[in-house]
A protein has these predicted regions:
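N-terminal pre-domains immediately preceding structured catalytic cores
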Residues: 2-190
Length: 190
């Protein structure tokens, strides 16, 4: 009988000790992950773009400095009559940085815009039909060569996944971001 009680006691103590060790390991891993997050958090303010909810946040640490409803990539696919005329209109995901800020940006119409509008594609890059002012709003903040945060002609479409990949915001928010955001500030898009 005593042997049975000792066996039962060992069976109870051993799992408790294993659980205690597991909890200690979890606590250590939790501290390590929190430190990793702290190390990854930018020291400057940064932009976070949620493409699922179409929200743009300007943050500093845990504080939200500005929140704006935006429009992001539609995910739609377009194919032209040539095999290299294929596009998917997604907003790129990842970590970027504000590389350039432009007032009164010039939109250089890409080939896909001519195909979408059933227009003849200009042969020469210098063709005047490619250049349009006012389409991108008053400002543009580039985070990649062909991708930017810019304005919109139709603020009613904010909050929708409707763009060709850029991030559109309303006029007041765009002016705030242009005046506030500095070159090099991180942009996180998911």
């Amino acid at each position: 009988m005593i042997a049975i009680l000792i066996s039962a006691l060992v069976l109870c103590v051993a799992p408790a000790q294993a659980m205690q060790a597991s909890l200690a390991e979890l606590a250590s891993e939790h501290r390590r992950l929190l430190q990793t997050i702290e190390d990854q958090t930018p020291q400057t303010p940064y932009i976070v773009i949620n493409t699922h909810d179409n929200q743009l946040l300007l943050r500093q640490g845990d504080a939200v400095l500005r929140q704006a409803t935006c429009a992001t990539g539609s995910g739609r696919k377009l194919e032209g009559d040539k095999r290299w005329h294929r596009w998917t209109f997604d907003t790129p995901k990842g970590r970027f940085a504000i590389a350039r800020k432009v007032a009164d940006p010039l939109w250089i119409r890409p080939t896909w815009d001519f195909i979408e509008n059933a227009e003849e594609i200009p042969v020469f890059a210098e063709d005047r039909r490619r250049f349009q002012y006012g389409v991108l709003g008053e400002y543009a903040l580039y985070f990649l060569k062909d991708f930017m945060i810019h304005g919109t002609l139709f603020e009613v479409n904010l909050g929708k996944s409707i763009t060709h990949g850029c991030v559109r915001v309303g006029g007041e928010d765009l002016q705030y971001f242009y005046e506030t955001v500095e070159l090099g500030w991180p942009v996180f898009i998911y």
